[in-house]
Regions:
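Left-handed beta-helix
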Residues: 1-81
Length: 81
């Protein structure tokens, strides 16, 4: 697992191979193996746990809302509820 300087990870489970880029915020979520979280992306929140599936990429500046279950990569700047 790699969490770059400036990234925030709080109350989250990060499986093997996960990379969280600088400026990303990961909160109350489960990231499966080999997930890449782009710079400035936001995953989860204070509510229900968000899930991101194996090998997916959450692009730079993208948002995955609390409680979301993600089975496909999320494009840069995209929002998933």
């Amino acid at each position: 697992v790699v969490v770059e300087e400036g990234a925030t990870v709080e109350d989250a489970v990060l499986m093997d191979g996960v990379v969280v880029k600088a400026g990303a915020v990961v909160k109350r979520c489960i990231l499966a193996e080999d997930v890449v979280v782009g710079a400035g992306a936001k995953i989860g929140g204070d509510g229900a746990i968000a899930h991101v599936g194996t090998g997916l990429t959450v692009g730079a500046g993208a948002t995955v809302k609390e409680g979301a279950k993600v089975f496909d990569s999320v494009k840069e700047g995209e929002e998933v509820c």
